[in-house]
Amino acid sequence: PADNTAVTLYVPDAELWSMDEPNLYTVIARLQRCNESYDDLYVNVGVRSYTVTPDGGFSINGVPTPLRGVSRHQDRLYKGNALSIDDHYEDAQIIKEVGANTIRLAHYQHSQDFYNACDSIGFAVWAEIPFISVFKPGEDAHAHCRREMTELIIQNYNHPSIMFWGISNEILIGGISQELVERHHDLQKLCKELDPTRSTTIAHVSHTPTDGPMHHITDLESYNHYFGWYGGKIEDNGPWLDKF
């Protein structure tokens, strides 16, 4: 009968994974009977730790490291979402070449090929579910969100590049309600039950009040501002951050 087995592995003098030195190890799970192999599963993993604090910012393996990044959609001209492995790795290489060390994957689960590229090339990744813009009340909709979050975490928790689980994006575009706030608290709880080792985060739309009930739900928060794009000037970013 099917069963679960937990094994603790000791890796002496491990070569740590980081964005600058993305060292990977291959874990092999092999199904055997009477010394005969029936199946193999190969998984690349990295050994690393990270912290995020208000005063110290982001540190990986104890080294303070500023995060500079971009957001990425899984999309190309004439291909749409159907990207090849080469496309995924080319995207990652281009992002690396501009000097970024962080990628936010908007706003849905991306291909395993791109997560693998982030593992091997070296990025801190924010992965999120497609819970965006407008909240749909009711048990069925929330059950779907929980299922999406569960799949995202369970399918990707071995990727050392993933540091942050995003629970929603600009959800207050459609307004706020008590149910919306409660559903976010439940998603936060679910994330911590499935993976207590990683940070959770949320992306607020620009007009979200800085003192409302949507704050302090996740470990980290961000604001999507479009100064110099939809309105204002690029120079407005600094004063807003100072005020925030």
Language model regions located:
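Short low-complexity, flexible loop/linker segments enriched in glycine and/or proline
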Residues: 117-121, 140-145, 215-217
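Active-site groove signature of glycoside hydrolases
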Residues: 148-178, 206-208
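Active-site cleft segment of glycoside hydrolase catalytic domains centered on the general acid/base Glu
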Residues: 135-142, 168-195
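Active-site beta-loop-alpha junctions enriched in small/polar residues
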Residues: 72, 108-110, 130-132, 168-170, ...
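Acidic-and-aromatic substrate-binding clefts and catalytic sites of carbohydrate-active enzymes
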Residues: 103-111, 135-137, 142-143, 208-210, ...
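Extracellular glycoside hydrolase catalytic/binding regions
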Residues: 182-244
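Short hydrophobic/aromatic-enriched beta-strand-loop microsegments
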Residues: 122-130, 219-225
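Secreted/periplasmic carbohydrate-active enzymes, especially glycoside hydrolases
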Residues: 1-112, 116-125, 148-151, 163-164, ...
